[in-house]
């Protein structure tokens, strides 16, 4: 009898041990649909937020900006995990003729999450296809972004995939929307001449208009080289400031606003993908290069364009290739 009792007790304990994991497994299985439902709801909410924010930005741009017509641009699609963009700061000269205040080429590597930026001096004396030799920024006035792309390719071996012409007002709006408290900048000297604002030396938080003025200032011994250096400083600072939740959540609205102030052939998907990857996962430091590089140019006086930079093309082409190919 004692043996039979012991056997029954053993079976009950054995059944309890085997049934307990089954009950836990069933509970996990029952929870799985709930978890999936929560994930789906969150994804839907995220999509709705992005679409709503983007449309809000577009509506703002429609009310305050002018319609823009996309230019022809035949940059090669390379499918190498990188995106390259010709970024032009645009202003209106007297008489309404467009001109480029700054010429940059930005490359973002989706695989290594690295961004590189080249600043091209606008006074480079270059061969402009169909027009002869002129300062390189003349190419934009003569034939828009496409002629400038051809000029960069011919003279420097730079052939970007996309272009973006940034209206100065759009830059100001973007800064004020993303960072309403201002962008921290160490202003190296008092600045006011021909920039539309008055800046005092020292550490300040600059709004969109002030930051634009800081980046455009050129009336010091450094001239355009100093301005390019400050533009690169601004880009570095913006990258560091963007890596926070409050800024990232505003990106969809800012993308919508920029549609009214940036003339570009980059599709919306490309803007979102690059912006989010760069803002969230990209390295904080943006590598930069100024073209022409040191000891590769000389100041010359030309009959048609006045003072210009005569560059060693081969030296600069190799420096650019090394810079872009470096991991």
UniProtKB/Swiss-Prot annotation:
Keywords, ordered alphabetically: Cell membrane, Membrane, Signal-anchor, Transcription, Transcription regulation, Transmembrane, Transmembrane helix
Membrane disposition: Single-pass type II membrane protein
Cited Pfam families: LytR_cpsA_psr (PF03816)
Region annotated Disordered, chain positions: 1-24
Highest rank taxon of the organism: Bacteria
Transmembrane segments: 32-52
Name of protein: Regulatory protein MsrR
Coiled-coil region list: none
GO CC entries: plasma membrane
Family statement: Belongs to the LytR/CpsA/Psr (LCP) family.
InterPro entries documented for this protein: LytR/CpsA/Psr_CW_biosynth (IPR050922), LytR_CpsA_psr (IPR004474)
Ranges of the Cytoplasmic topological domain: 1-31
N-terminal signal peptide: none
